Design a protein with these regions (language model features):
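Canonical Radical SAM [4Fe-4S] cluster-binding loop centered on the CxxxCxxC motif
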Residues: 1-40
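Structural recognition of alpha->loop->beta junctions
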Residues: 22, 86-92, 197-204
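Core AdoMet radical
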Residues: 28-48, 52-76, 91-104, 138-165
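Acidic (Asp/Glu)-rich catalytic clusters
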Residues: 53-56, 83-90, 112-121, 131-138, ...
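Distinct, well-ordered alpha-helical segments
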Residues: 76-84, 105-116, 193
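Short, surface-exposed connector motifs at secondary-structure boundaries
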Residues: 89-95, 178-181
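Long, low-complexity, intrinsically disordered polar/charged segments
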Residues: 109-161
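Conserved C-terminal portion of the radical SAM core fold
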Residues: 123-126, 163-204
Length: 204
């Protein structure tokens, strides 16, 4: 995955939901040096590929990882431009989109489903190392859920509840889009039993 900064912000920082962000939020702490919003997506991809080739020398294809802040927090037409720009890079075979569960809607998810089945970008293809040809990109949505407990979500100033997260995951999965979920186990106030119960809820 090549980490990208597409210049997004977050509704929990700009005043739409809250200000200051979540209590633990520090995007700069996990930014690679090549990933800065002042560079084009293609430049970030080129530099990210060069960075990773030191370790993964035989890798031919990459996923563009929209990681910084909430990467569906923009009008749909803007998202289309950004996602399709990343997918136009010849070594990119798919997208991983990190976002908040309160930053998706039916229209955005319908578009992502169309990307995933190939109908949004007809003619897009990639020759794979095993001799096959992909006619649709990989599309994965990763939600920052963090906790199953509303009391914890309030404590960390998350700005949404667990019902919102569950609904977003179900809406995404119902469209056949691959879904990932980020949790932070052991947040202040959570017990071992709560963590085990969280695992059970995640597995549902």
């Amino acid at each position: 995955k090549i980490v990208l900064d597409a210049g997004f912000t977050c509704p929990n920082r700009d005043g739409t939901v809250g200000r200051g962000g979540c209590t633990y939020c520090d995007n700069a702490a996990f930014h690679p040096s090549y990933s800065t919003a002042g560079k084009s997506l293609h430049q970030q991809l080129d530099e990210g590929i060069e960075f990773h080739m030191v370790r993964y020398r035989t890798t031919e294809h990459y996923l563009a990882y929209f990681q910084s802040f909430s990467n569906t927090y923009a009008p749909l037409e803007r998202l289309k431009v950004l996602y399709e720009e990343a997918l136009s890079h010849p070594k990119v075979v798919g997208l991983v989109i990190g976002t908040r569960p309160d930053c998706v809607d039916e229209q955005k998810l319908d578009y992502l489903a169309a990307l995933a089945d190939g109908s949004a970008m007809p003619g897009w293809s990639r020759d794979m190392a095993d001799g096959t040809v992909r006619h649709a990109p990989v599309v994965i949505v990763e939600y920052g859920i963090e906790s199953c407990y509303d009391s914890t979500l309030r404590r960390i100033n998350r700005g949404h509840d667990f019902v919102t997260a569950r609904r977003a995951v179900e809406m995404t999965a119902a469209r056949g889009i691959d879904v990932g979920a980020h949790f932070i186990l052991g947040l202040p106030g959570e017990t071992r039993q709560m963590m085990l119960e969280s695992c059970a809820m995640i597995n549902e």
